[in-house]
């Protein structure tokens, strides 16, 4: 049986996919930073993602201070991937609002990474 995804990214773009089900998650063009830390190790910050569902928003104290975040999950296999920044309380962290953290442990590179 073939799984279908909500959104497919163009095959001409370098993409990041769910390591468990290979659903597309983000285009390399949407990558903002590789210098983030998730709860399970290194993580990337993306401007936008696809095939991702958000949980409830909650306040958490992260390495850079208090934030309101929502956990994100792969829509296809329900694997926890990281979180979405809903609100940053520190003015220096406002750039993260509306952005997404995906942990490296949960994604793979596909399409054109030769």
UniProtKB/Swiss-Prot annotation:
Residues in Yippee domain copies: 14-111
InterPro entries: Yippee, Yippee/Mis18/Cereblon, Yippee_fam
Pfam families linked: Yippee-Mis18
Molecular-function annotations in GO: metal ion binding
Keyword Metal-binding found: yes
Binding site residues for Zn(2+): 18, 21, 74, 77
PROSITE patterns, sorted: YIPPEE
Keywords recorded for this protein, A-Z: Metal-binding, Zinc
UniProt keyword annotation of Metal-binding present: yes
GO biological process, one term: regulation of synapse organization
Disruption phenotype: Larvae display reduced nociceptive rolling behavior due to impaired activation of second-order neurons (SONs) in the nociceptive pathway and reduced the synaptic contact between nociceptors and their SONs.
Coiled coil regions, renumbered to chain: none
Job description of the protein: Involved in regulating synaptic transmission in presynaptic neurons. In class IV dendritic arborization neurons (nociceptors), involved in regulating activation of their second-order neurons (SONs) and maintaining synaptic contact between nociceptors and their SONs.
Family, similarity comment: Belongs to the yippee family.
Name the record gives this protein: Protein yippee-like
Source organism per UniProt: Drosophila melanogaster (Fruit fly)
Lineage: Eukaryota, Metazoa, Ecdysozoa, Arthropoda, Hexapoda
Gene name per UniProt: Ypel
């Amino acid at each position: 049986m073939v799984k279908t995804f909500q959104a497919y990214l163009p095959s001409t773009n370098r993409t990041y996919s769910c390591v468990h089900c290979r659903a597309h998650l983000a285009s390399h063009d949407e990558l903002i930073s590789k210098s983030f830390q998730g709860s399970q190790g290194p993580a990337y910050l993306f401007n936008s993602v696809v095939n991702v569902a958000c949980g409830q928003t909650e306040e958490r104290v992260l390495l850079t201070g208090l934030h309101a975040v929502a956990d994100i999950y792969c829509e296809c296999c329900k694997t926890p991937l990281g979180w979405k920044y809903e609100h940053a309380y520190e003015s220096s962290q406002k750039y993260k609002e509306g952005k997404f953290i995906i942990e490296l442990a949960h994604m793979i590179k596909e399409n054109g990474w030769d």
